[in-house]
A protein has these predicted regions:
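Short glycine/acidic-rich loop motifs that flank beta-strands on beta-rich extracellular proteins
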Residues: 86, 99-100, 120-122, 164-168, ...
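Right-handed parallel beta-helix
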Residues: 113-114, 151-160, 199-210, 222-236, ...
Length: 451
């Protein structure tokens, strides 16, 4: 009897151990098979009350509801906050107008409900500084909100950063009418937010709208979270010169040589690309220490309105690895995954996964040469650009052109996979033979199985 009880007890223990093991969830993996850190699953908001003393700007001489440009007064509040050990600079209900502001280590920005930090519509109010633009380190105009070397920097809402871009957009399109070859940089415009050389950055529950140029730009940052943000710029009717035109180059989030970035629960509608991976451009870009790769980028549970590309790699990019776009809804996007291939830049896009998307778009996958403002130089050892290990799976969408891909002697495409896809496709251009070692499994286009 005792023996039977012992055996039963041992069997029960074995069952409990086995059941316990079954309950342990296997870690999620990046496309290259390495584990995704638990950090990427944590969308807990920063508790602003833990960030230090509140510095409500109107308590320090800043006028509310005033059209006066108060850059000097607002910067004085930021500087005082830093000098007194750090804290949170608060924009209360109402609005204040400013040029370029520079946050210091230990300072943070909160914009309260119905509060607005509004950018000046005069470029003279934005400082010329050494900064980063279009894959280059150069002198250009600072953003409205700037933070360099600010580990732990936090921007939180629910109020608004309003770039007030109307005058800049109109000037841009007038300039283009006068000189159709004018560059983006020649039309002098500030960005809304520029954060550089910073770790553990959080931008949460804030409206960031109407940027004159790129909306958010992060350079050489690590562990960045964009959580629940509303990012918007108009896509048409910004100028009587040409009512079809929208807010030019108003990219939602530009990640420039950044690692470990989560964009979660955000809404993006801009007149350019949404989430963009950058890192350098030019024939020698891979040799420049100011440039760098984008790695471990997760875009999850977002909603896209009209954008040029939901997830765009390039064009100013040298190496992007372990990039995931998942569980998003798309409405009226021009492209979903856009791999821009610059003939003048050595580029390597690898281990990218797009999955669990619904909605509608013009083109889903685009891989084409990109030659806007490019300057090829002679280089004997110029590497051949390549795209490899690109996975697209679990997609249900209506497309005008699901597969917008072209071959070139300037780049190589290999090891793509398409799995569990059900789409409508007016163009009907799906041709996996254009890609080396392309795997197709359970792909249905216009009701016709393709594998």
């Amino acid at each position: 009897m005792k023996t039977r009880l012992t055996a039963a007890f041992l069997m029960l223990m074995v069952c409990m151990v086995v059941m316990g093991k079954k309950q342990v969830k296997a870690p999620e993996l990046w496309p290259d098979g390495t584990p995704i850190a638990a950090w990427f699953a944590d969308t807990t908001r920063v508790d602003v009350s833990t960030l230090g003393k509140r510095y409500v700007v109107t308590d320090y001489g800043v006028k509310n509801y005033s059209e006066q440009v108060q850059t000097k007064e607002l910067q004085a509040v930021i500087d005082r906050c830093a000098q007194e050990g750090g804290g949170v600079v608060v924009i209360p209900r109402g609005f204040v107008v400013s040029g370029s502001l520079f946050f210091k280590p230990g300072t943070h920005l909160k914009i309260e409900e119905n509060g607005e930090l509004r950018g000046s519509d005069r470029i003279r109010d934005f400082q010329l500084v050494k900064t980063r633009m279009e894959g280059q380190t150069l002198n250009y105009f600072a953003a409205l909100v700037n933070a360099d070397g600010c580990d732990g920097f936090t921007i939180t809402g629910p109020g608004t950063i309003n770039g007030n871009g109307q005058a800049y957009w109109e000037e841009f399109w007038i300039r283009r009418q006068f000189n159709k070859d004018c560059t983006n940089l020649e039309a002098m415009r500030p960005r809304n937010v520029y954060i550089s050389h910073s770790k553990n950055v959080t931008v949460q529950d804030v409206r960031i709208i109407n940027s004159p140029f790129w909306t958010n730009h992060l350079y050489k940052c690590e562990k960045v979270r964009y959580l629940g943000c509303y990012i918007f710029a108009p896509t048409d009717n910004v100028t009587p010169v040409d009512p079809k035109q929208g807010a030019p180059s108003s990219d939602a989030i530009d990640l420039d040589a950044c690692q470990d970035v989560l964009v979660s629960g955000c809404y993006m509608n801009v007149c350019d690309d949404a989430v963009v991976l950058k890192g350098g451009k030019g024939t020698w870009a891979d040799k420049d220490p100011d440039n760098g790769p984008c790695e471990r980028i997760m875009v999850s549970d977002c909603t896209y309105g009209k954008v040029h590309g939901c997830l765009t790699l390039g064009s100013e990019s040298i190496h992007d690895r372990n990039v995931v776009l998942r569980r998003c809804h798309v409405h009226n996007a021009n492209r979903v995954l856009w791999l821009k291939m610059r003939p003048d830049t050595p580029q390597h896009y690898e281990y990218v996964r797009v999955e669990e998307l619904t909605g509608d778009c013009a083109s889903f996958l685009v891989v084409r040469p990109w030659t806007q403002f490019f300057k090829p130089e002679d280089r004997a050892d110029m590497p051949l650009s390549k795209c490899n290990n690109i996975m697209i799976r679990n997609i249900q969408m209506d497309c005008s052109n699901f597969f917008n891909v072209g071959k070139s002697d300037k780049f190589r495409m290999t090891d793509f996979s398409f799995e569990n896809i059900k789409v409508s496709d007016k163009k009907q251009a799906f041709n996996p033979s254009l890609i080396e070692n392309c795997q197709v499994k359970n792909v249905v286009i216009n009701g016709e199985k393709k594998d």
